[in-house]
Amino acid sequence: MSDKNHHSKCPVIHGANTNQQASEFNWWPKSLNLEILHQHDHKTDPMGADFNYADAFNSLDFEEVKKDLKDLMTDSQDWWPADWGHYGGLMIRMAWHSAGTYRIADGRGGASRGNQRFAPLNSWPDNGNLDKARRLLWPIKRKYGNKLSWADLMILAGNMAYESMGFKTFGFAGGREDIWHPEKDIYWGAEKEWLQPSGGENNRYSGERDLENPLAAVMMGLIYVNPEGVDGKPDPLKTAHDMRVTFARMAMNDEETVALTAGGHTVGKAHGNGDASVLEPEPEGAEIEDQGFGWLNKTSRGIGRDTVTSGVEGAWTTHPTKWDNGYFHLLFTYDWEITKSPAGAAQWEPIDIKEEDMPVDVEDSSIRHNPMMTDADMALKYDPEYRKIAERFRDNPKEFEDCFARAWFKLTHRDLGPKSRYLGPDVPAEDLIWQDPVPPVSYYLSEDNIDALKMAILNSELSIAELVSTAWDSARTYRGSDRRGGANGARIRLAPQKDWVGNEPERLQKVLNVLDEIRTMHHSPISMADLIVLAGGVGIEKAASNAGMNISVPFSQGRGDATDVMTDAESFDVLEPIHDGFRNWLKSDYVVTAEELLLERSQLMQLTAVEMTVLIGGMRVLGTNYGGTSQGVFTDNVGALTNDFFVHLTDMSYTWHPAGDNQYEIRERASGQTKWTASRVDLVFGSNSVLRSYAEVYAQDDNKEKFVQDFVAAWVKVMNNDRFDL
């Protein structure tokens, strides 16, 4: 039955909220979006909780996979023919765009979850026709099944594309596990339209041209910069500014930027030989019969030489299916002028180019076309610093190859996490500083050794709050987004972390000194990383004892101590906490509310809403507030692990009153006297209906023990977030 005959449709009860138009956030847009804490659970994962991807990947015949991928590169399909009979350029673009969404500020984006398969990325204008690349890979994905994730396959396909065209890559590591629905936590920008120029409503720029943090791309729907120029207006020097900002936010320096731009454009071509206005919608907006294909041209041929993707048209080099130094040869040999592609996009073409330097047509080798350069390519020629590097690479091809190989590996592996997560036979032996290396430990402590250390910590001058706060501060830097930070490595001892305001340097140094003395007195080989975590557990056990409960906080030894040489101090600046709701601290006043910042940190720490709730309640009664403040400490028995925070939060004997920015007073309803003070973070657990439901559970008389058990479980999760060896 046709669905286009609206008058013939039958009425049907339809009570499910099956699209995004009717949700509580439309009615109450200021509601906390707790859904970002509940993504990617096993209800959406078809593999089930017992599936171990690492074991599956390690059972692959890896050489066979690579051979199949290399064979695919030259197996052109009629439904989407390969340029010059080689899919290399398409596969490299797919891999680049999978990895290129990574931004260093919050570690989100990147290649490690296969998110290019889902909205919004699968429908970004800059990802045009990458749906075809993934469909070309489907026979290989189907063949190897659960052993090879889409996330790993897309990056490996990019590597094999380069190798099939004569370039030796630096290596490849597997270990990227697929997600199964769009990521709800990533902020891609406030714009409401694709490719919106700067200066309009919901603009991501302020001031002269200050890009909003944590964004890296210059426009909604682009991976990095606009190939036509800033806001579509060619000006290589202005584009160079955008490139420097964008690539820095992708964790790349100038040398890596030049290498990646040149290496990415040494092969393949851009597509703009047609009318973009006739293209069908992107995959998410396509008709059901299109089966997830977007940007279809149903009015003309629309494939091969007639493909339209970015609108820019042409190859960058003379031999687009061969790795060589031709990119720099053309860039510096010829003068270039601004032209328009058949699709109307601004691009640069050479003046008076020799015929032998012109690439041949993708379908007919008897025809030659002008090569082209984007505004980003011309930036390498016009920007003085970029030009120095580009000329050096032109004159030293081997240096260029090495720099590009390393930069490509970094681009495609940055968000995979530490080297301990790497899988497969092609993992490079060399340790790289951006991997945040941590040395392995060579000791194993017996239970008696651990008990002796715990007793020494318990008998030291350190308070419960000092022990717990220091362990928390060491572990809270962990980001589940790119798996950076955490307690392993004990980089809280090193610059810059030891001097971060949020770590209370004076208190931190006191605790570290005492712990180091204990380690020395006991002649213990234990790392400071392990000792800091062990000490936090001692503090919690003492607090539970003070509440009348005897517990043991699980402790998994095996953390190493990083050194300054192993640490790129500048790269850790982005991990510095400027807020921590768990310790009731804000470094400054922010436009974003304190409770939203708490949600942000909780999501990066991979906490559920329940875990976030129980941790807040426990941290408050342990007295771990920054600076020892009393905000939210709803107890007369600080240092005892009780459920007092939740009991008093939900007690109707009190009323709540604003008392300044992010400050509230809790007054006795009968007398009007102030009993406690609180922050917005504290109050949200009583005001938000979902969080209050959790708070009520922990306030119940029969859940005192459950509160302690759940707090310990959540605490151990935080301490072990970066223990990928467990």
Curated annotation (Swiss-Prot):
<keyword id="KW-0408">Iron</keyword>
<keyword id="KW-0479">Metal-binding</keyword>
<dbReference type="InterPro" id="IPR019794">
    <property type="entry name" value="Peroxidases_AS"/>
</dbReference>
<comment type="subunit">
    <text>Homodimer or homotetramer.</text>
</comment>
<dbReference type="InterPro" id="IPR010255">
    <property type="entry name" value="Haem_peroxidase_sf"/>
</dbReference>
<dbReference type="GO" id="GO:0005829">
    <property type="term" value="C:cytosol"/>
</dbReference>
<keyword id="KW-0575">Peroxidase</keyword>
<feature type="cross-link" description="Tryptophyl-tyrosyl-methioninium (Tyr-Met) (with W-96)">
    <location>
        <begin position="224"/>
        <end position="250"/>
    </location>
</feature>
<dbReference type="GO" id="GO:0004096">
    <property type="term" value="F:catalase activity"/>
</dbReference>
<dbReference type="InterPro" id="IPR000763">
    <property type="entry name" value="Catalase_peroxidase"/>
</dbReference>
<keyword id="KW-0560">Oxidoreductase</keyword>
<dbReference type="GO" id="GO:0020037">
    <property type="term" value="F:heme binding"/>
</dbReference>
<dbReference type="Pfam" id="PF00141">
    <property type="entry name" value="peroxidase"/>
</dbReference>
<keyword id="KW-0349">Heme</keyword>
<dbReference type="GO" id="GO:0042744">
    <property type="term" value="P:hydrogen peroxide catabolic process"/>
</dbReference>
<feature type="binding site" description="axial binding residue">
    <location>
        <position position="265"/>
    </location>
    <ligand>
        <name>heme b</name>
    </ligand>
</feature>
<dbReference type="InterPro" id="IPR002016">
    <property type="entry name" value="Haem_peroxidase"/>
</dbReference>
<feature type="site" description="Transition state stabilizer">
    <location>
        <position position="93"/>
    </location>
</feature>
<feature type="cross-link" description="Tryptophyl-tyrosyl-methioninium (Trp-Tyr) (with M-250)">
    <location>
        <begin position="96"/>
        <end position="224"/>
    </location>
</feature>
<comment type="similarity">
    <text>Belongs to the peroxidase family. Peroxidase/catalase subfamily.</text>
</comment>
<dbReference type="GO" id="GO:0046872">
    <property type="term" value="F:metal ion binding"/>
</dbReference>
<comment type="function">
    <text>Bifunctional enzyme with both catalase and broad-spectrum peroxidase activity.</text>
</comment>
<protein>
    <recommendedName>
        <fullName>Catalase-peroxidase</fullName>
        <ecNumber>1.11.1.21</ecNumber>
    </recommendedName>
</protein>
<keyword id="KW-0376">Hydrogen peroxide</keyword>
<dbReference type="GO" id="GO:0070301">
    <property type="term" value="P:cellular response to hydrogen peroxide"/>
</dbReference>
<feature type="active site" description="Proton acceptor">
    <location>
        <position position="97"/>
    </location>
</feature>
